[in-house]
Amino acid sequence: MNNPYENWINFFQEALNTNIPSIEKIEELVYLGIGGSGIPGRILEILELPVKYQLFRGYKVKVNEKSTVIAVSYSGNTTETIFALLTSLKKTRKAIVITSGGKIEEIASKHNLPVIKLPKGLQTRFVFPYIFTYLIRIINEGLGTNYNVNELVEGIKDYSKLNEISGILASQIIGKIPIIYSSTFLPIAERFKQEINENAKYPAFYNELPEANHNEIELYSYPSPYTFYPIVIVSDKLDEESANLINAYKIYPLYQSILKNIASLTLLAGLTSVKLAMLLGVKPEQLNIIPKIREKTFKLFEGDINADQNL
């Protein structure tokens, strides 16, 4: 497999230069998505938006007439997101769809919803730069915020440094169970876990600081049949002290800018997972069980989705 993370700077740049539909004023924001299409909405929580923001990663959703819904499904056929969007449209007509096509684009067309198209032919987790860039552009227009979206590109220009760190991390992780901790960057700790799971087919977990200091930290006080490898994404002095106490590998954000750090840390997660996959001799792009559960999920919801589409 050609390493898709090597193309991220181009992906970010393309998303910056692509025209998107005009966005109406946003009073409340709801994000629908799951898996690789859901994690950009989770990472958006880091920004602490100036309006009520809710993330739903499943088929259950709560919206009202004030809600602007962003429904993201890379394939366009994510059952849970389709069901959640159809449920949302019973309460609000303010919705935006981000997809490469599929059933959700058909629904958007039927309901005259704006669509932002993603390129086809990639795994969902690899298109993060497109989705997240579009999200920032949407909130800048809909909320009147002024995030410098160009900082996403600037955050990954030091690719060689991130690549070097990823190699060190992967070599340290192999043979151990990584647990990634953070406070401010907790959503990126979750992304690290997901990337290692999907690309390397390897166990990984994450937890929140300082919450873990009051329970999970005791894992490191006694010998265990498992070899854990703690990693802390450091954002403050308490993160630093927590890392020192459990002898964790420390990841320091490279920048003062939150968008630069989101881009660089997310890229680091991807690079680390691919390096780990190479060490393990597994194919990052290959999925074995996920397609099976997608098919079973669709069969469970097929009748409800078809009924809602006909309303």
From Swiss-Prot:
Biological function: Involved in the synthesis of UDP-N-acetylgalactosamine (UDP-GalNAc). Catalyzes the conversion of glucosamine-6-phosphate (GlcN-6-P) to galactosamine-6-phosphate (GalN-6-P).
Organism: Sulfurisphaera tokodaii (strain DSM 16993 / JCM 10545 / NBRC 100140 / 7) (Sulfolobus tokodaii)
Catalytic activity: D-glucosamine 6-phosphate = D-galactosamine 6-phosphate
Alphabetized UniProt keyword annotations: Isomerase
Domain SIS: start-end pairs: 19-141
Isomerase found in the keyword field: yes
Stored Gene3D superfamilies: Glucose-6-phosphate isomerase like protein, domain 1
GO BP terms in the entry: carbohydrate derivative metabolic process; carbohydrate metabolic process
Lineage: superkingdom: Archaea
Molecular function in Gene Ontology: carbohydrate derivative binding; glucose-6-phosphate isomerase activity; mannose-6-phosphate isomerase activity
CDD domains reported in the protein's UniProt record: SIS_PGI_PMI_1 (cd05017), SIS_PGI_PMI_2 (cd05637)
Lyase recorded as keyword: no
Protein name, per record: D-glucosamine-6-phosphate 4-epimerase
UniProt-annotated catalytic positions: 198, 214, 294
